[in-house]
Amino acid sequence: MILEKEFMREEVVLYARKYALTRNPLFYTFEGIGGNCTNFASQCVLAGSCTMNYTAVYGWYYLSINRRSASWTGVDYFFDFMTTNQGVGPYGRVITISEVQPADLIQLQNSEGRFYHTLVVTKVEDGEIYICANSNDALDRPLSSYDYASLRVIRIDAVRYDTRYVIDCFEALYSPPVELPQNTPQSEAPSESEPAPEEPSAPTPPAQAPTEPTPPERLEPPPSAPATETAPASPTSPSENEAVQ
């Protein structure tokens, strides 16, 4: 049976602040092959929903570097899933910047019309919006300090879940963080002269109907999860179709 539950906005903010300047070792870090911002945003949304969508190609899930959906790490794919999802998992809509609240998600657009960065709102105070992000790392950074041409805001309304597969994800999500090297840049805005890197390519979808995978410990998906995706043995270079910062 498919039911709906509340999207836990407080958990999103807590997770965002905890891992803005560190990394959760349960998830691959994409800095070296494009950028980690949408991967980080997906983790934050997972903290507020504890529900993935394992639909092949069009779902929203992460099992490993080569077993993930395009929507987990790609700016535009993330937007498309969150604003059009009719199945299990979080779902939402586009709102105006004047409506923004903590746990909303902001995506920045450059002067060429490309959305390149995903931010997690953690505070709205005295007319200023504060965000957390990865690559470049930011902890409660003012949105006004970013240089961008335009933006769009995603509001997650609720979460659909299958009552057969109710999983408590918090023990896994709140693993000890991995500290970053001290010389890792933090809270630096991408500039137009140095275009933001794009998101690494998503794995190729399975050629036939998926079967149950063997997921990481403590993050067991339902039997509908995809089996093995055709993907390179090591992370590949970013493509023009998946943008991130």
Predicted regions and their residues:
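...with weaker cross-activation on analogous glycine-rich loops/strands in unrelated enzymes
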Residues: 61-134
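N-terminal capping segments
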Residues: 1-73
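Short, solvent-exposed loop/turn and secondary-structure capping segments
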Residues: 54-57, 118, 143
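Short loop/turn segments at secondary-structure transitions that flank enzyme active sites
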Residues: 47, 51, 125-127, 137
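A broad, low-specificity signal marking well-ordered, structured residues that form hydrophobic/aromatic
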Residues: 12-14, 129, 151
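Terminal transmembrane helix and immediately flanking juxtamembrane interfaces
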Residues: 94-96, 137, 145, 169
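Catalytic alpha/beta core of large soluble enzyme barrels
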Residues: 132-133, 137-148
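Low-complexity, Gly/Ser/Thr/Pro-rich intrinsically disordered linker/tail segments
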Residues: 144-223, 229-245
